[in-house]
Structures are given as structure tokens and as C-alpha cells.
Amino acid sequence: MFRVRAPWLKTLVELRQGTTQRRALHSKYRHVGFGASAQLQQSCECFIQKLNRELPRDAQLDASIDLPKKTPSYHKHLMLISPPDEAGKDPEWKGSWQAKLELNPEWPYSAIAEVKKHLKETKRGEGILINAISVMRSKSLGDPSSEKKARFLALPDMKVYEVSQSELKDFAYFVGEGMVQQPRGRAVAFADYLKGADAISKELEHREVASTAAAGMKQFAAQSYQNNLVLVCGHHQRDERCGQIAPRLIKEFEAKVEEDLDLAIVSHIGGHKFAGNVIFYKFLGFEADGKATVDSLWFGKILPSAVPTLLEHLGRNEIITPWFRGGCLLES
């Protein structure tokens, strides 16, 4: 992942080859404090001062605020891939991502609200994080085959799906692992409870949750995706801080990491006042049963001049605690 090969990259290679047991890599990292060099500290302070002169008064960067150690609770990240940028226009992440992206009526962004609505009717929809991404660099996330289809990258599934408007409901049921049925029949009576907790639990489960197989849920073909990915929050119309910092961070990552690492700008992931916000997704490989595992690391308060330091410490299996929001292991 880095131009200077590190033990961190070697571990990823071993995992892909199936020579290492599955594990949450972030739990192996050593958390360290951070005593910034005078040069880095001065560079960050100058950047913040310059940026704050360009930002509204109610959207200033404040480096003194402590970063909360909090990330969303989720088991899947579903990302709508924005169409390619058009020459002579603002990039998609700047011109097409309105403050509340799910209210955008234009295709393919209108797919977000539709999928969100139907995920509420599914077994595991509650734990699915949904965003839009604008791909800045990738050899595997090419252009869509049709403008009439929305493309979604799903992690940890490691799949790219193309979905038409008429398929959005079925797609939501597919990624949400089946539709939850409304309870039917008589109410549960006191006599049912006398049969014991196990019996009543089975009765409720039988009533409420439809089996995926029984429901005849539609399946979706997909393109395989097995890359590592860095997401930088750049939801410009929601908060200008991220919108200003994101392209600068992307430029730094492009210069400092190898070309097989995919880079994308992502819509709102929380914590705009702690911009820049960065997510590292590291593909760990497939288990014997075909399930994929992905490790995620969330960071905040990353400024362009801090990128080399962040990468240097990650290369030594170290996490700089003041910049770390949290992390988790995702399993398909």
C-alpha cells in the first residue's frame, strides 16, 4: 500500500494468500501519543489559519477540540458510485452532492432514498451505512456499463452491483438479507408463555421473519472488488470544511501511496468540525466458506501536511491516538 514496503503491507499479502488466521488488524496496532515536530505543528497551524480565512465564521476549524472516539455502528458499507465528472463542470462531489444527499431527485442519487426506505423493511438493514463516493483513483472501479443503472460498492461483500430503477426495492431486500414480515395471526397469549422462553422465541421468529429462500429473494450479479480503499470525507455542500480539505488530502495520498490503493471522496461520515476525516478499508481476504473480511480504521483531524506522518506510523503498525476515531472488523 505504501511505496516503502512495510510489515503492515506484508501482513495484508499473507492474509490474501490465506497464510494468516483471520483477525482484526487494528487490534494489533500499538496506540501511540503524538509529539508533533515544530515543523509539522507550524505547517498545520498555518494551513488552519489560511483555511479559516476562506471559511464561514460558523464553520471554522479548531485544532484544540478533542476528537471523540466514536464511529457509526455498522456491519456493511454500501456506497453509490457517482458518475464520472464532466469537463467544464464542478466535480460530482462538489456540484451534485446536495446537503442532504437522499433528497436529490436526480438519477442515480435518487436511488439512495429508495434503497434506504426499503432497507427499513429488511432483517439487517439497520446496520448498513449508506454513502455516495466519487472515485478519484482506481484501476478496478471503471465507468458504468449504462447510465440507466446505479452502481453500488458493497463492503465487506467486496462486490460492485449495477442496479436499475425498477430493481431498487429488490436490491435493498438483497443487501438487507431478506424482508421482515409483519406479524400475522392471533396475539401471543399467556398460555404461550407457559411453554417457556425458547418456545415463545421460536413462535415469534417464525411469525416475523421470512426465510430468504422461502421469499424467493432476487439475486444480483456483481463485479468482484478486492482492493484496499481510502475514503476522504468531502461533502462540500453539507460542510465546507470537508469540501475544502478533501481534494488537498487526496493529492497528498496520491503522491505518498502506491497506485494499487484506491482513493475516493465520500459523502458525510460525521464529525465535520474534525475535518479531515479519513477511513482506511483493508481487504483481509476470504475464508474457506467464501466470506470476506475487511478491516476499517477511522481517523479525524488529518491535515494535508500530516498525511506522511500518518502513513509512516501505520507502516510501523502504530496508530496515533489523538487522530483515531475508532475501527472495526467487517465480515460478509
UniProtKB/Swiss-Prot annotation:
Pfam families found in the cross-reference section: Suc_Fer-like (PF06999)
InterPro entries named among the record's database cross-references: Aim32/Apd1-like, Thioredoxin-like_sf
Homology family: Belongs to the AIM32 family.
Full protein name: Altered inheritance of mitochondria protein 32
